[in-house]
Amino acid sequence: VTVHQAQQNYPKAVKSCSEGVAVMLVPENVGEIIMQSGMAKEQQFMIHFHSPAMKLWEIDNRSLIYQMPDRPYIAPEVFKRAGVMIDVFPVKYNDDFEISLMAKADGHSRCYGMLNWGDTVDQGYTVQGRGGGKPVWSNNEYDYPHACALMYARTGVRRFMDYLIVSAKHWMDIDVC
């Protein structure tokens, strides 16, 4: 059994014993998880039935493939020719600039946990006091996910699509309720 992004979506637990296997998406005794009306947190897990002779590395490989599956790829030229977005497609790429954009996306703050994975606290708004002493959640309001979508279209780099999917799933499960 492997739970998709279990660490990012904690608390999670998997238990195996002589009576069977249990996947605990919200384990007992973890404290309160408060969900508002309309929230519907999607959780995915894979059960892989295999022979006892299967090697551990093969089982691990199945889990890794499940955690990071193949994704479809559309070449940046196809996006550009389609004309469905602003022209973010340079004639010549500058490696230093591209690396800095990737580093900015990779360094974007992230919050973890079942209700927070895919979101982040907006430190600027929080410091300004807009939350009345409480953190102000960005709820991925447009900028970061939109930038990731454009970056995926213009480069085809998978990490941008992965970041976008995590944000979109958070929107669907938590923010749009």
Model-derived segments and spans:
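Catalytic cores of extracellular degradative/oxidative enzymes
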Residues: 1-177
